[in-house]
Amino acid sequence: MFAQLISTLKKSPKTIVFTEGTDPRILEASARLLSGNFLKPVLVGNPDEIAAAAEDIGFNIRGAEIIDPENYDGMDEMVDKMVELRKGKMTADECRAALKKSNYFGTMLVKMGKADCLLGGATYSTADTVRPALQLIKTKPGNKIVSSWFIMVRPAASGENEVLAMADCAINIKPNEDELVEICKETVSCAKIFGVDPKVAFLSYSTLGSGKGEDVDKMRNACEKAKALMPDTPIGGEFQFDAAVSPAVAKTKHITDAVGGHANTFIFPDINAGNIGYKIAQRLGSFDAYGPILLGLNAPINDLSRGCNAQEVYSMAIITAALA
């Protein structure tokens, strides 16, 4: 998967903002990206501190652009633009103060076209990455929410990687029917970029009416709405997980559609199920988990786990740039 993404990026290199420019993991990943010559890092922070940090750990970041919010020539223009975007919710002084923070500053670099995408969160919380994106990048026309998905990858016996999509595992706590449909639509669209031919299962503790309750109704209704919205995408449910992935179980439960037993894209009923589900696949199923990848924004802004390593930063940078 990554070889194909890199090949595509080499034909049209992108620029990515890293909001934590002195972090050793960011610097190591930036050095690797620069050596590949397909993605240009923009490191936010003090140039002397970034250079010293890179030298201390022995990574060559020559070729990266370093931008310091404290000494940025375009700050007045950026403040004016942010005031306009916030529509009276922040004064110029409040915007200027916010732009001293690398998460807001980096997001505005993307908004103003100085970079194609952003990756943050190595030291920031998810909220501190998502909040500026919601306020400044905003959601796509027609979208009401930001959501997230994970790419799950593991080697298969055939020699090719097995790739699954799981959503929403990180952002929306208890999405309603229409929000689940939006999550499904955005996940399907993005999954195709990464080589997944989506077969979507809306997951539940019930399979086609075997269980009862409001949560079952929610998933069943959302599934029907998604089918109507995307008639060319195989979508099924509500399914229990085993019925979604096991042909034998699907046969036993008399599921006859194209999704039952063969699903590769999973829509969870809430964040509890989604977060637990992807981590079980990661820890017990030997899948590598990449994400959360944010959905529904006007530009690619993604969040790292604070426990990430340099390899995960490198991989997420490629994934983020592929969406630009």
Task: Give the ranges of each region predicted by the language model.
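Anion-binding alpha/beta catalytic cores of soluble intermediary-metabolism enzymes, centered on
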Residues: 1-260, 265-324
